Amino acid sequence: MVRCKVGSGAYAANSAIGVDCPAHISTEDTMTGRKKLVGQRIAVLAADGFEKVELTAPVAALRAAGAEVDIISLKSGKIRGMNLHQPADLIPVDWTVDEVSARDYDGLLIPGGFINPDALRQSSEARDFVRAFDLLDKPIATLCHGPWVLASAGLLSGRTLTSWPGVRDDMVHAGATWLDQEVVRDGNLVTSRGPQDMLPFVREMIQLYAGGPASNGALRRRHSDPQRESPTAVTSAAMRWMPRSPIGAMLGLALLGAGVMAVSRAGNGGRISAVEARGASE
């Protein structure tokens, strides 16, 4: 069982996943105090490179609402999360995707991240797993880059959704109507832009799994919103959800960058020397 300390932003968890509760998600906010999802079993489809907060925060809310949650992946053992571009915790996998069926679950959650959905969308087993949920009209919740998986599964034609703004064109090209709003609900699908919209996403996700009506602002529209003029605001908002970088990690990134530059210079040394020699002879 996972408990969210109201207003404190701290989690106490007896599960295998250590969860950092986002500061603005409380028991009342997620409506988990009423145990809306008791008896439900939710599959979380994730691979290495999942965005940590996009898995841990929704999973904690689901468990607090009474749901049983399984982590499903492409491999057994553990998978590595990310805090944006930095490695985060390992979490244990409950089942591999070839060991389970959509019929075993009441709903599906697909977290985002840069790497995770790219790996999932290249797996035929993952695509089939996701496709089966839609075929059975079971609820699917995803955010950030997670809708990439839906696109590769061929599920977006005629749908209305949102995603990380940077993949807006991918969604439109897959046949979807893309909206630049916190959360969008279309039938059995709930989507959100990213960590900056975690609170409305979690609320709507629980409503979806519980069979409740869509909230105001989550309803579909007919035409896609335009591309953004600048990524600055939404990127900065998402960064506020990320843990502070430890000094060691920052130093490691600096050393890695220096190493890449050194290797690049060494590899280009001969070409640079030749150019310089040619210039000197002219």
List the predicted regions and their residue ranges.
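Extended, subdomain-level signal for the structured scaffold at the beginning of enzyme domains
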Residues: V2-V6, N14-L136, W148-L155, D170-D180, ...
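ADP-ribose/adenylate-binding Rossmann-like module
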Residues: D137-L143
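Catalytic cores of processing enzymes, dominated by hydrolases/peptidases
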Residues: G154, S163-W164
